[in-house]
């Protein structure tokens, strides 16, 4: 069972090392497990809802960015969001604002490059919720793991990751507007994901059609 395998044996840290398709597969498994249980009392969501990866624009909204571009590439280039970091507008960050490339992680980084003078105390992954949430109450929007979103980057087969991870050190890559284009089949111990719960529009259309006797007119 993909979902159970993905969850692993340590629920405190993010799941990593998945392709984008595997992340989407987990969302499908989670939806089914929480709304299609034979014992209706165990269902946590109704059939009107489902889980999926966030879109690129949804991720930006969760991070508090205001963007107007039509595509991820256009939104990334918007100067108004330059210098906006998960912790504020200054660089380098104060200590203990998130899990980034730091003194604790230096031996695990291929190039040994870190945020100079920064130490969050974690070599690699940190427990979810180990740092303060952002202004809307979400944890680890910046750092810990790069997060897959639904969109592709431009007219390419590359997917997009947002947020930076425990191995991110550069000022440019830590800006919240930054997008990381990667092959959707690529795996990394710093790549993870978060899920969003949405109203299932397709399911609503099906139900409406049934209510109308199956007529589309």
Range-by-range predicted roles:
Residues 2-180, 184, 189, 206-207, ...:
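Functional-site microenvironments in short loops/helix caps that host divalent-cation chemistry
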Residues 189-204:
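Short, structured beta-strand segments at or near domain termini in extracellular proteins/domains
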């Amino acid at each position: 069972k993909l979902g159970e395998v993905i969850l692993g044996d340590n629920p405190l840290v993010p799941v990593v090392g998945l392709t984008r398709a595997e992340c989407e597969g987990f969302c499908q498994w989670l939806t089914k497990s929480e709304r299609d249980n034979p014992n209706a009392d165990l269902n946590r969501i109704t059939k009107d809802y489902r889980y999926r990866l966030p879109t690129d624009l949804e991720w930006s909204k969760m991070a508090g960015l205001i963007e107007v571009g039509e595509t991820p590439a256009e939104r990334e280039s918007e100067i108004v969001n330059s210098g906006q970091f998960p912790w504020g507008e200054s660089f380098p960050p104060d200590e203990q604002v998130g899990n980034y490339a730091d003194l604790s992680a230096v031996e695990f980084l291929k190039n040994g490059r870190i945020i100079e003078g920064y130490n969050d105390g974690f070599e690699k992954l940190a427990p979810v919720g180990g740092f303060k949430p952002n202004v809307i109450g979400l944890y680890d929007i910046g750092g810990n793991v790069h997060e897959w979103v639904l969109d592709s980057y431009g007219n390419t087969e590359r997917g997009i990751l947002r947020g930076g991870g425990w191995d991110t050190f550069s000022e440019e890559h830590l800006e919240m507007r930054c997008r990381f284009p990667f092959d959707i089949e690529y795996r990394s111990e710093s790549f993870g994901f978060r899920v969003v719960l949405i109203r299932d529009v397709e399911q609503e259309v099906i139900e409406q059609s049934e209510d109308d006797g199956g007529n589309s007119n």
